[in-house]
Structures are given as C-alpha cells and as structure tokens.
C-alpha cells in the first residue's frame, strides 16, 4: 500500500461534519445510526457494545488502523461486502487522510 498522507485536522473536521456526523459521533461512546468512532483506532470491526452490526462487519475481524481505515474509506461496500453503511466512500486520498487525522485527534481527547 502506498504511503498515507499525514492529513490535515481542520480539513478532516470539515469532511467529518459533511460526510460522517449524520450517522456517527466521535466525542462520546454513544451510537447513532452508526457506531461511535471514539476509540476506533485499534478496535476490531463490529465490536461496539450495544450496536446492531451487520453479520459482515462482525465477521470481518479487521483491526482499525490508519491503513485499514484508509482502504475502507475508499469504498466501504467493497472492503466489507454486506455492510449496512450506506456511505459510498471518499475517492480522494487527501480527504481520507484528513478524516483519519481528525478522528485520531478527537479520539485522543478524554471524554467529557
């Protein structure tokens, strides 16, 4: 896999608000239409307690890292066939890297 750009927090925040916020939170352990993204780095797919995952997400068994998220965010339905996530993906590498940077920074903050 090619090197992942470092990403820009502010640009990632904008991508998150436009593309992710409707279904996901990053600043709490609550779930919405999608599972919380708080603590996603290092977590195994399909393991947020209380969230009703698809069988595909539960059985994928991927550990979310910068690399796996970068690949997943390109085309979620291709990466996990059968996922319930309706998001089509982010084709631009910089946008994916920016979003990952934003998630990393937000997840490093203690919960309120």
UniProtKB/Swiss-Prot annotation:
Post-translational modification: Binds 1 heme c group covalently per subunit.
Molecular function per GO: electron transfer activity; heme binding; metal ion binding
Keyword entries, A-Z: Electron transport, Heme, Iron, Metal-binding, Mitochondrion, Respiratory chain, Transport
A GO biological-process term: electron transport chain
Subcellular location: Mitochondrion intermembrane space
A cellular component annotation (GO) from this entry: mitochondrial intermembrane space
UniProt cross-references to InterPro entries, sorted A to Z: Cyt_c-like_dom, Cyt_c-like_dom_sf, Cyt_c_1A/1B
Keyword Membrane applies: no
Top-level division of the source organism's lineage: Eukaryota
PROSITE patterns xrefs: CYTC
Positions annotated to bind heme c: 20, 23-24, 85
Keyword Transmembrane: no
Family membership noted in the UniProt record: Belongs to the cytochrome c family.
Function: Electron carrier protein. The oxidized form of the cytochrome c heme group can accept an electron from the heme group of the cytochrome c1 subunit of cytochrome reductase. Cytochrome c then transfers this electron to the cytochrome oxidase complex, the final protein carrier in the mitochondrial electron-transport chain.
Name of the featured protein: Cytochrome c 2.1
UniProt source species: Caenorhabditis briggsae
Gene name linked to the record: cyc-2.1
């Amino acid at each position: 896999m090619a090197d992942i750009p470092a990403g820009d927090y502010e640009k990632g925040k904008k991508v998150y608000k436009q593309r992710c916020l409707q279904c996901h939170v990053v600043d709490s352990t609550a779930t919405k239409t999608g599972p919380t993204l708080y603590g996603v780095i290092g977590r195994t797919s399909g393991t947020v307690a209380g969230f009703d995952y698809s069988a595909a997400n539960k059985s994928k068994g991927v550990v979310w890292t910068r690399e796996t998220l970068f690949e997943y965010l390109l085309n979620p339905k291709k990466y996990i066939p059968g996922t319930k996530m309706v998001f089509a993906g982010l084709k631009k590498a910089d946008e994916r890297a920016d979003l990952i940077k934003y998630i990393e920074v937000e997840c490093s903050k203690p919960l309120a």
